[in-house]
Amino acid sequence: MKRKKLFARGLIIVTAVCMALASVACKKDVPHEEKPQNTVTKGSAWFTENGRSDYKIVVSSEARDEITFAKEELIYFVEQIADCKLETVSDRFAAYDEKSTYISLGRNELFEKTDIDLSAANVGNSGYVIQSVGNTVFITGDGAYDYGTIFGVYEFLKYTFGMEIYATDCITYNAEKNVKMPVFDVKERPDTDRFYFEGARTDYIGATRLGMINVTSFCASMAQGHSLTGILKMSSDYVGKDWLTAQDQLCFSASEMYPVFAKNLIRIIDENPDASRFFLGNSDAVTQCTCNRCIAMKEEYHTNSAGLMMIFFNHVLDTVCAYTDAHYPDRGIEFSTYAYEGVFEPPVKSDGNGGYIPDSEAVIPHKRLKIMFTPLLINNMYTLDEVPNKANFESLIGWASVASEIEMYGYNYYTRSTTVTSGTFNTFSDTIRRLKDAGCTYYYEEGPTRGENFVQLKLYVQSKLCKDTTLSYDETAYDFIEHYYGPAAGAMKKFYQLFKNYYASNRENMPGVCQTPISSIYSVKFLQENFLNTQISLLEEANCAIEDLKTEDRQAYETYLWRIREEEFPARVNRLQVYSSSMSATKIKEEVEKIRNWPNSLPNGSKYEAPGSQLGVVVKYDTYFTNLLK
């Protein structure tokens, strides 16, 4: 069976080059549990045959945008893989019996005629059921939004055509045009109910194809992030009152403020009918109220500032949820707040047996309030149970012991403004497993906006691990490298292992938290010269590995070249940042011109740019390069 690779939505298709996995000396991740297997067996009915299909897609006549997107993705990929364009029919006009040949997407009239029980399947917000009933296949997600149906479509394509999405511009599948429809009995709930990795590569299509859901896209702008003060100030009721500190932080003990805040929050909900997520975060980088009422309230409930905030939310959300349940029972409205600066420590105490109990019944978070744990000082060079992170992790466990739902706001640390990658290669798999065990249902990572190493690899690998925490980080990374770099995979695996080993053996010298000063990152202690030189040497080896493609397959050559350069850019920039003072003027000029000329250096003026290409960072660094040449 031939294996094909889809390089971009522009539909440049080339034959994939199969390569053996290079043996690498490393400690493998050890899965901590086994997962039950779903049942997918061979069917007898043809799905696609000689460019045609008897199957039609059925969607509701009132389908949400997510169902429309799922339908478009199914049509798109089947047409590209099997040269067969599927037709769509509304559920109002789909005559249904056991012999019908339909692919039903989401909840619709056909689905309601089945015995499929989504509640019993318990698939969460991003899980799905793929179920054969007769010749018809039902792909259905649950939750207020239909992302599960989208993800179910990708899983259907994986089972049917062997399709795997490594990146928006790297999708593999089995090149078979005549395929029989499998018989499905699949119920899938990802280990992390929802996750999202922020960054330059996570446009809607790219993120969705990797299984991400960005819950901030469901938010009303007035109730997103650090929103409490803004919500209170929507009306003038606060004027002349002592409800705010001098720094505009709410005074949570001001009980007369509670109904005013609830009224304003209800107004936001009314005015934003498409929003379902409402973040209720206190002001950023501002101390908590220390008035006499707050001090007295803490003493009364034997609690801390976070406890006062929970008391405030409990009163407000009792009012708001009674309103939303009556007026918007089907909107799936949810609320969350940050466990962050000033309210980071949970309102709990030891139970004497290694666990935690709430400071009082009054501080137990409202059952509709999600706690988004937001630790600024987590060090990604260490696992959560190691000394640098242990206190933070205990705080997470404390929150998880009292909250109905816990979420995680992570940081891709210093990479938002540098070309230095974070060291999650050795720790992410442990982190996501511990978060799963703690009951974490959402993982959000504030990520890179510029050109660090391994952006696309991390998006793929970490997305896979969020869905299935039993996977090995290394094995998943090697699989990505194999397909993403083709003939250069051997060199790129060594490049990946270089980083893993270096970060593991030098972690005590390496800054791992998001507030690390830039001067500490671009340092001889952190970025040793031999480490940078070895990076560039391995990337030159990767370039040599694709040289034959210049004449054999020009488009494949340009694709692989650009992907290698996306790794070479930070390597060369980091070397200039730290060691330019010891370079000759000639060497500096050579290095700068090499980088500056990359966008135009391909012969015949041809150019290939991957979505969100980090080579665009050349513009950001142009002033820096100019100053170096002076």
Predicted feature residues:
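Bacterial N-terminal signal peptides that target proteins for export
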Residues: 2-14
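C-terminal motif of bacterial Sec signal peptides marking the signal peptidase cleavage site
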Residues: 22-25
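Acidic, contiguous N-terminal accessory segments
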Residues: 27-129, 171, 177-188
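Aromatic-lined carbohydrate-recognition surfaces of secreted/lumenal glycan-active proteins
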Residues: 313-349, 406-413, 443-446
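Catalytic domains of carbohydrate-active enzymes that cleave complex glycans
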Residues: 465-630
